[in-house]
């Protein structure tokens, strides 16, 4: 089977507070053989912009991310597990974690909530049956999925995604300085490939995740704008791109650990665009 070929028997497992322990036990087994983890999150948009003076546009972009991640709560996390060949485990390949979120009490951008509601996210169920992030963090820390150099993380334009995960795992606000953020990032996620960053070296590939998937002739499983389906599509895109553009080998020195839109590798930093993360927050569209 070619890498990342769609197999419709693959299932996305919905995880709520009631089945979290059971599903994390399965993940602790799966990660032993399927050490590529494609990840996506859903979060409630962008609600704030930093004020004051900034050393550079790069500094502004990170402060924009930081102030929004600090203020807001994650809604969903999708994790898809694959092996070196891009193959899935038998049965469930993707776990979609649904976190506690209250539309009455928690902050959000209205347009983001409308998009997620249209996409099938059940906010009433998130309020009543959602996972507590602190307990999830305890389970994730001992799962073998984070803090492990043998695990390779796959993502798409993922500054916000990793920002929310670091906030959960440290149970604290993000560090004030971007360099400190990347130090923590490397601790929890030693190997990261951001598909959007890889696209810089892929002739004619452009756009958001859905557009890229269509260019690569990949077929989505599950609903768009939900973290499980998006993580699965991200993993499929990585392996298809690795085969088509990188001769099945990614140069770690050039690509590992770079997040598109953050740090010195950011095209936004270089061209001075001020709304990098507004775009990222709407990257699902």
From Swiss-Prot:
* Effect caused by changing residue 141 to R: Abolishes interaction with CNOT1
InterPro entries assigned to the protein according to its UniProt record, in alphabetical order: CNOT7/CNOT8/Pop2, RNase_CAF1, RNaseH-like_sf, RNaseH_sf
rRNA processing among keywords: no
Note whether Cell membrane occurs among the keywords.
no
EC number from the UniProt entry = 3.1.13.4
Q: Where in the cell is it found?
A: Nucleus; Cytoplasm, P-body; Cytoplasm, Cytoplasmic ribonucleoprotein granule
GO MF, one example:
DNA-binding transcription factor binding
Residues binding a divalent metal cation 2? 40, 42, 230
Keywords annotated in UniProt: Cytoplasm, Exonuclease, Hydrolase, Magnesium, Metal-binding, Nuclease, Nucleus, Repressor, RNA-binding, RNA-mediated gene silencing, Transcription, Transcription regulation, Translation regulation
> Consequence of mutating residue 230 to N?
Abolishes RNA deadenylase activity
Positions that bind a divalent metal cation 1? 40, 161, 278
Judging by the UniProt lineage, the source's domain of life is: Eukaryota
Listed under catalytic activity are: Exonucleolytic cleavage of poly(A) to 5'-AMP
Subunit structure, interactors included: Component of the CCR4-NOT complex; distinct complexes seem to exist that differ in the participation of probably mutually exclusive catalytic subunits; the complex contains two deadenylase subunits, CNOT6 or CNOT6L, and CNOT7 or CNOT8. In the complex, interacts directly with CNOT1. Interacts with AGO2. Interacts with TOB1; recruited by TOB1 to a ternary complex with CPEB3 which is required for mRNA deadenylation and decay. Interacts with BTG1. Interacts with BTG2. Interacts with NANOS2.
Q: Which family does the entry's similarity section mention?
A: Belongs to the CAF1 family.
Functional description taken from the UniProt entry:
Has 3'-5' poly(A) exoribonuclease activity for synthetic poly(A) RNA substrate. Its function seems to be partially redundant with that of CNOT8. Catalytic component of the CCR4-NOT complex which is one of the major cellular mRNA deadenylases and is linked to various cellular processes including bulk mRNA degradation, miRNA-mediated repression, translational repression during translational initiation and general transcription regulation. During miRNA-mediated repression the complex also seems to act as translational repressor during translational initiation.
Protein's recorded name:
CCR4-NOT transcription complex subunit 7
Organism source for this protein?
A: Homo sapiens (Human)
Q: Taxonomic classification, please?
A: Eukaryota, Metazoa, Chordata, Craniata, Vertebrata
């Amino acid at each position: 089977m070619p890498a990342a070929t769609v197999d419709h028997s693959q299932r996305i497992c919905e995880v709520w507070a009631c089945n979290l322990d059971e599903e994390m036990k399965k993940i602790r087994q799966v990660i032993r053989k399927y050490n590529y983890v494609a990840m996506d999150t859903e979060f409630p948009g962008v609600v704030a912009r930093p004020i004051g003076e900034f050393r550079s546009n790069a500094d502004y972009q990170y402060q924009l991310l930081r102030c929004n991640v600090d203020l807001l709560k994650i809604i969903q996390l999708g994790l898809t597990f694959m092996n070196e060949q891009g193959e899935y485990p038998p049965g469930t390949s993707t776990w979609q974690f649904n976190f506690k979120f209250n539309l009455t009490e928690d902050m959000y951008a209205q347009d983001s909530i409308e998009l997620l509601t249209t996409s099938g996210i059940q906010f009433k169920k998130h309020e009543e049956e959602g996972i507590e992030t602190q307990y999830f963090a305890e389970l994730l820390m001992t799962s073998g999925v984070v803090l492990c150099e043998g695990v390779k993380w796959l993502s798409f334009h993922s500054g916000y995604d990793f920002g929310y995960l670091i906030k959960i795992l440290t149970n604290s606000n993000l560090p004030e300085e971007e360099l400190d953020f990347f130090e923590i990032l490397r601790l929890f996620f030693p190997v990261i490939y951001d598909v959007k960053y890889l696209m810089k070296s892929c002739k004619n590939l452009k756009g958001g995740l859905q557009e890229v998937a269509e260019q690569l002739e990949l077929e989505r499983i599950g609903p768009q704008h939900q973290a499980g389906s998006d993580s699965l599509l991200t993993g499929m895109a990585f392996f298809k791109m690795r085969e088509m553009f990188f001769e099945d080998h990614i140069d770690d020195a050039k690509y590992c650990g770079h997040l598109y839109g953050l740090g010195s590798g950011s095209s936004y930093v270089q061209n001075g665009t001020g709304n990098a993360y507004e775009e990222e927050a709407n990257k699902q569209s």
